[in-house]
Amino acid sequence: MGQSVSSEEETKQDYRTVKVSKGQLQRLFDKNCLSLLTPIEVYSLKENLHVRDINNDKQLSIDETVQLLGLPKDCPCNEVVYDFVRVLGWFPFFNSVDPLKGISLPMLIRSVVLSRSKSFFKLFKGDSSYKFEDLVFLVLSILSEPKDLVEKNLDSSCDETGVLELALQGDSNIHWAQCKVIKDFDNTNIKERKVSAYNLAIFLTFLLAISRPLMSDYSQHLSQWSNFMSHGMNLVRSFDSSITERSLHSKTVGYAAFISTIETKMPNVLHPLDALLDSLLFMKQSKGASDVTPEFSVSTKLINEYSLAQLSTVLPLELCYSRLRKLYVGSESGFSMRSFESKCFNWNAPTITFISGHRITSKKTKRYLLFEEQFPRSRAAEDETGSDFDHANDDSARLTFAVFLNQHWKTSNKEPFGDSKTTIFQLSPRQAVFKSSTFRKDYCYFNTSGGGIGFGNEEPYLKNNTTKFRPGNVSLTIDSGLEFCVFRHLGKGGSFNPMVLEDDSIPVYEDRFVISDLEVWGCGSEKELLEQAKRWAWEEKEAMARQRINADTLGEERAFLEMAGLVGNHGASGGSV
């Protein structure tokens, strides 16, 4: 490896350990990181930093880093992003973080390699015991520490000559994930650490703003910070439903809540970090406009650049940004089952249905009282009202749900449809994912006899002008007038799995709201989109052909109707046949 190490060895599993100094380990790690960059990437990095030597002692200030990354000068995220890159660059010696030092070139290279999923995987040889989410949490927790505490840790940890263990496979193949200083995060008990809710909100909002693939310039999206921030708050409340914008500076998020929330509610949220520092690895003029994913061209109240960014935390990027087609928007086509059917039933590919509104505050209207007779409140949910989980803060908050349906829509007055890929999402005021279970298969129904639309329900009881909904333990129900919606969450045993909190408890609650927006968007692969376009073109051609036939026979038909006295002005109310 080009560095001398002592000969003290001991056998451990399939690798052995040797003793090295802190300085030796750091140099070996830096050499490994550099080897994971291509020559053109190293060249571009030096050109962008205006240095000739990769070992240059130049240190980047926050202003220089902001300019290099193309961030707006006064963006609220600048300090958090700069400190994240800087602290990540101290890897693996996190107890040696110096709050007074800038970002050196070796630190920047470490941050580049560690933040990119491909190089991270190669560096740690795909060892699943060392998780990227753990590393991100640790860095954010260090950012949340008071500076005097960071300086105290620095004073007690700096020792270039300290003896450390280096894990080797074979003669010189270093197994970094099994090195003690890396495996235990520089002797840090990560499970006892906390992340500031404010830093987390800023960090997540930044990730949403840069989530669009192949974005060459962050400034345009970051200039819309407040719009992304509202969706970032939806994500933050997923970690702790009691967090509000006012309590951001006083609230914290622990390790268990951070990891479980990332894994179950927003598995893709950290993916934008993959390209965070990519702009430094390319010459500025080398990215053309054709390389950039175009802006989303069709926006509605529920679907726009900001909501798509949040949706991409649970769904694939290519689906969110290039495979959506507007099918039905209630505010444009009317809130009726017939309009819904006419717009959606010809789409023979997966769809995402979005439902949004505000909690019902006036419970004395005739229409709602009738709906409450058809869908009685859950006693179990009423008994739990006022719990710590209680509905994410206040009645004025907008509730937004989405349902991914893998099969095409159809009328189902007797049997439900859908498959195991059907998934319910909550998007505001917090985010949650409710995947299908194997216990029941009542995934979806579209009932044209007065039963409305249901996900996770049995078909409603409809007889003698009586309607009774039969909701599942985790279900989303829309009445036949597309006016009211209920999300019920009582526990296990239904067609969808419930949310499980950090302490393994299952919250019991029910959200009832008046629908203000209802939209359906088609999605699928390029092949499916092309086939659908051909089908629609054929249907349009057939419709035009029928119109021509009607026009050709109009004269004969009218003459017959006039003879029967059914059309024309004959001075009489009608004729007889």
From Swiss-Prot:
It is found in: Cytoplasm. Pfam families: TLD. Keywords: Cytoplasm. Transmembrane segments: none annotated. InterPro entries: TLDc_dom. May be involved in a process influencing telomere capping. This is Restriction of telomere capping protein 5. It comes from Komagataella phaffii (strain GS115 / ATCC 20864) (Yeast).
